[in-house]
A protein has these predicted regions:
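Long, contiguous, secondary-structure-rich segments that constitute the structural scaffold
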Residues: 1-19, 74, 79-94, 98-178
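Long, low-complexity segments enriched in small/aliphatic residues
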Residues: 1-81
């Protein structure tokens, strides 16, 4: 079966079919957790990419999409993000308190998010403002709820995957009353 093939191929999966039936499960290898890196120096290797901050207009922010604790890739298992203290909701936009003030918003307001890349309007409606200790001029939203804001032409050079960590957005009050 496929698990037999996996255990022949991937280190740490030895006796997978037996171990998977153990009460409480088992840990798969994780080089970061174990402090073991398969490099010449047996250390992690970091690189710094050239990055130029985009010039933002007065009302623009840089949005990044993130995953919640209860999520694996696009599979959402629940509405809680215990990492960030956000519960029972995913349509949130996390903002720095100074940006909230600058945009004349308050924690809990309902807003719409816009992207105008290439002259095309993209909108994600009805997001709840959450004050969060994020750098100024930045916003964080959950993936895939704001994928609509990522231009289809905005992709990484080599992998051609959507570039969803630097999306320029505008935030407008929705005037929706909860």
């Amino acid at each position: 079966n496929i698990r037999d093939d996996i255990e022949k191929t991937i280190p740490g999966f030895e006796n997978y079919n037996e171990r998977v039936r153990n009460h409480g499960g088992f840990y798969l290898p994780h080089c970061n957790r174990e402090g073991r890196f398969d490099t010449a120096e047996a250390k992690a290797v970091f690189s710094i990419s050239d990055y130029k901050n985009p010039e933002l207009k007065e009302n623009e922010l840089i949005m990044m999409t993130i995953r919640s604790h209860d999520q694996f890739n696009t599979t959402i298992y629940g509405l809680d993000d215990r990492y960030r203290g956000i519960y029972n909701e995913r349509r949130v936009v996390m903002l720095n308190k100074n940006d909230i003030k600058k945009l004349s918003l308050k924690d809990g307001d309902i807003v719409d998010l816009f992207n105008f890349d290439g002259g095309k309007e993209r909108v994600a409606k009805k997001f709840i403002v959450v004050e969060y200790p994020i750098p100024e001029s930045c916003a964080a939203t959950y993936f895939p709820e704001t994928n609509v804001l990522v231009p289809i032409t905005s992709v990484a050079e080599k992998s051609n995957t959507p570039a969803s960590k630097q999306v320029i957005i505008e935030i407008r009050n929705n005037n929706f009353q909860r």
